Amino acid sequence: MIRGGREQSMLNRAADYFHDFHCLAGACPHTCCAGWEVVLDEETALRYFQVPGALGEKLRSVIQADAEGDFCFPLRGGRCPFLNEENLCEIHLQLGEAATSVTCRSHPRFIEDYGAFREITLSAACPAANELLLGSREKLTFSSWEDEERSEPADPWLEGLTALRTRMLSILTDRKAPLRRRLTDFLLLAWQAQALLDEEQGEALGDLARTWGPQALECGAGPGLFPWALRVLGELEVLEADWRTLLRRGEETAPARGDEALLERVACYFAFRHLLKAVNDGDLLGRAQLCVLAVLTVERLTPVCGGLGEALRRFCREIEHSEENLEALLEAFCQREELSLVCFFRELCLS
């Protein structure tokens, strides 16, 4: 991007704890090299075909093409074939980090490039990142820095959407109100913003962000989200077999109110990562519903998972790391009555 006759460097944004992250490597209790099949970018795969010696022979014997035609490392016993007995990567040890695939180098980072800026989220499915997120009860803030990469022109209404997200984050962190009231206002603002997007008035999002104020809401009688939302989650693609068991136990266990300060940080984590992705398809409300569903589900699963951190880790691993599951939920918010917006409002108002 060129401003004032000068090329603009890339602006990066991330949570305030981003630079404190350190991989636990072999000490990680839930290694990212198990349970997920590693898909290789083409450049890395071609480089692996040229590696000499015993490691090169193993690489060439292991690499296969998956159903989509992508190169991958099929799991062996649920583990990457290059994960050794100390839970360390043989490729990293022998060739260095730069020789690992893009997927392996970037994990646990979710990286979203919006042209004018880039945003990076440390996945809460990673134990080290999870601990950083939940290791403070302070309001979650976000830092920024520039690098030498050049930015590109942004979508015309990304600026308004970014301002709207800032307003939505400020709602979530307004501790003068109970968390459920904040989540209600968060959804109400998303609902009104969605009406503008549906009318192709994205340029008005900034004005809405500046002028919006809390509104009264009549919930009415009827069902809330639970236990039906847990059953919908159980219909999705599953990574670990006991996930559905945990969801069923969540149905049977009396819900308990969680720590609002920590759940607020969870809400901000999801809002930061997901809301701006509406620039790609216009579905802001669905992503706001995803954020609220995540908070309420994690809170509900905390007793059966043995703690908030583990409940969040499992939700992120099963849902947030599956594009198929995320897309299925966005579709369900539009089509499934048990996940309708009114059910969200009833759950928040009556629970």
Annotate each PLM feature.
Residues F18, L75, E152, G282:
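Active-site-adjacent structural elements in folded domains
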Residues N87, L95-D185:
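Internal, well-ordered alpha/beta segment that forms a basic, Gly-enriched binding/recognition surface
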Residues T173-S351:
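Hydrophobic, aromatic-lined core segments that form the binding pocket/scaffold
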Residues D20-V38, P74-F110, S123-E131:
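Local cysteine-cluster metal-coordination motifs and their immediate loop/turn environment
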Residues C23, Q94, A154, L158, ...:
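Short, charged/polar micro-motifs that form catalytic or ligand-binding hotspots
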Residues I2-H30, G115, A128-N130, S143, ...:
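Long, low-complexity, compositionally biased intrinsically disordered regions
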Residues Y17-E68:
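Polybasic, low-complexity association/targeting segments
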Residues M1-D16, G53-C89, E97-S106:
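Short, charged low-complexity linear segments at domain edges
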